Amino acid sequence: MDATYRRLLGAALVAALLLAGCAGAPPPPPLSEPVAPLAPVTRSPREVALERALGEFSGAPYRSGGTTPDGVDCSGLIQALYQRTGVRLPRTVTDQYQAGAPVGVNDLRFGDVVFFNRYCQTRGRGPYLASILSLGDEDEVCHNGIYLGGGRFMHASPRGVFISRLDAEVWRVSYRGARRYFPGGN
């Protein structure tokens, strides 16, 4: 096989893979029964303040030790969000984990904080090694995010502040628990 043929074959393979990735799933079948509208969600004043603060931080860049929308890390995000609701939290993930009331995974509500050991292994080695190294110690917590509902949570990772799903394998296997900080629930 000459070099030109190999390059042409490689380019064709890449193009085929890209086109296959663009193909969408077929549309879902129509529903046989009408769907009832969702009941309106009533939020407490603290939850309204939390929703507003979430908007401020959405898409913020990652900055180790940061606590502002200009740059924030995971525990700084949680501390800053709760500060805007009038609730003072400690600064570190470990201290935040110890401060809240435990919540079962099936009882999660908007505003609860979820904890993981996903980034524990990166200490002293840089955050980008997290994707290739094994998880941290079973009992250690070193990453957290705020639960939004519907299995989603917002967190600050090395890629910035964004929303992930709890049922994604990386988060499911590194999940260590949740805490509630609003007095009397949310």
Predicted regions located by residue number:
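Aromatic- and glycine-rich peptidoglycan recognition patches
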Residues: D2-A3, A23-P45, C120-N186
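Post-signal-peptide N-terminal segment of Sec-exported extracytoplasmic proteins
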Residues: P28-S32, A36-S75
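Catalytic cysteine-centered active-site loop
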Residues: S58-F110, F115-L129
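C-terminal motif of bacterial Sec signal peptides marking the signal peptidase cleavage site
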Residues: L18-G21
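Extracytoplasmic/periplasmic, Sec-exported soluble proteins
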Residues: T42-R46, G66-C74, A99-N106, G136-E140, ...
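Bacterial N-terminal signal peptides that target proteins for export
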Residues: D2-A12
